[in-house]
């Protein structure tokens, strides 16, 4: 029996680097011989920018142009080929201040299923808006096998990660969703990450170093893999993403997280910075 596609949902604090991370993971998965579809779930519709080099038309744009007649839409109307053979879709969103972005995600999945698009891929990756875990933007968790949380070594990102973990736990009550783990992005240290996972056990899949090229790649509209074609010094950075891909393709067991209460977590992370030993280390 053919193994079905693995579905991933990538979350994290706004501005933490989810889309950059997602695009590089998608290319890494493609480098491992997998057919990959990345679905951007953000009204900014810029998730796939580093794969395609431009802002592709969204599902909502296409539906509006076709008068919301699903039968008039074909896969080539909404799926764009990006770098490394990764296929790209942008859900888009309602006008600012109106409608529900989560509804748009649901309509996107519905349309892609009608087009039998999901049947064509080995991996489907949802790159989701910020750290919003309302019912709407938690919608990709309804379709995912694994959630990945992108963080750094800072208080705010880990606080957001804990809230996302709570959302995963809630969704896991009714479906086989698991947290694959944390991905540390652009951080020179991981001591606060380690402090958090000692209190809230969960895997740390990989921690990417504080390298400016990771941030710059977003502005250039290129993945690290594409940049490495002309700058071989970036190949070791690409290896981090290949490590993540290998971990995910092994289909890890994952966990149902047990997040900390907000006040408990606030005290834990605040205490980390307030301890005398920590203060001496910072002098």
From Swiss-Prot:
[4Fe-4S] cluster binds at residues 100, 134. This is Light-independent protochlorophyllide reductase iron-sulfur ATP-binding protein. Its EC number is 1.3.7.7. The lineage of its organism: Bacteria, Bacillati, Cyanobacteriota, Cyanophyceae, Synechococcales. Its cofactor is [4Fe-4S] cluster. Component of the dark-operative protochlorophyllide reductase (DPOR) that uses Mg-ATP and reduced ferredoxin to reduce ring D of protochlorophyllide (Pchlide) to form chlorophyllide a (Chlide). This reaction is light-independent. The L component serves as a unique electron donor to the NB-component of the complex, and binds Mg-ATP. It comes from Synechococcus sp. (strain JA-2-3B'a(2-13)) (Cyanobacteria bacterium Yellowstone B-Prime). Transmembrane segments: none annotated. It catalyses: chlorophyllide a + oxidized 2[4Fe-4S]-[ferredoxin] + 2 ADP + 2 phosphate = protochlorophyllide a + reduced 2[4Fe-4S]-[ferredoxin] + 2 ATP + 2 H2O.
């Amino acid at each position: 029996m053919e193994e079905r596609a693995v579905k991933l949902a990538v979350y994290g604090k706004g501005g933490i680097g989810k889309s950059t991370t997602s695009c590089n993971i998608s290319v890494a998965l493609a480098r491992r011989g997998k057919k990959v579809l990345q679905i951007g779930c953000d009204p900014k519709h810029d998730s796939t920018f580093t794969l395609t080099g431009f802002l592709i038309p969204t599902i909502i744009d296409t539906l509006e142009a076709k008068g919301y007649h699903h039968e008039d839409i074909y896969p080539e109307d909404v799926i764009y080929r990006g770098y490394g053979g990764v296929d790209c879709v942008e859900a888009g969103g309602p006008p600012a201040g109106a409608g529900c972005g989560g509804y748009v995600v649901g309509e996107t999945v519905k349309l892609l299923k009608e087009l039998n698009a999901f049947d064509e891929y080995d991996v489907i990756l949802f790159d989701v808006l910020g750290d919003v875990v309302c019912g709407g933007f938690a919608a990709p968790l309804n379709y995912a096998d694994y959630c990945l949380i992108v963080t750094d070594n800072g208080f705010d990102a880990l606080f957001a990660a804990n809230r996302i973990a709570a959302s995963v736990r809630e969704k896991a009550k009714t479906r086989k969703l698991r947290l694959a783990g944390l991905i540390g992005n652009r951080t020179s240290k991981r001591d606060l990450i380690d402090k958090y996972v000692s209190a809230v056990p969960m895997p740390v899949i990989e921690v990417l170093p504080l390298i400016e090229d990771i941030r710059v790649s977003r502005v250039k509209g290129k993945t690290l893999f594409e940049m490495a074609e002309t700058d071989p010094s970036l190949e070791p950075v690409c290896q981090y993403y290949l490590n993540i891909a290998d971990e995910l393709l092994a289909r890890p067991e994952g966990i149902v997280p047990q997040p900390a209460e907000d006040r408990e977590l606030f005290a834990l992370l605040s205490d980390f910075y307030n301890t005398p030993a920590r203060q001496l280390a910072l002098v």
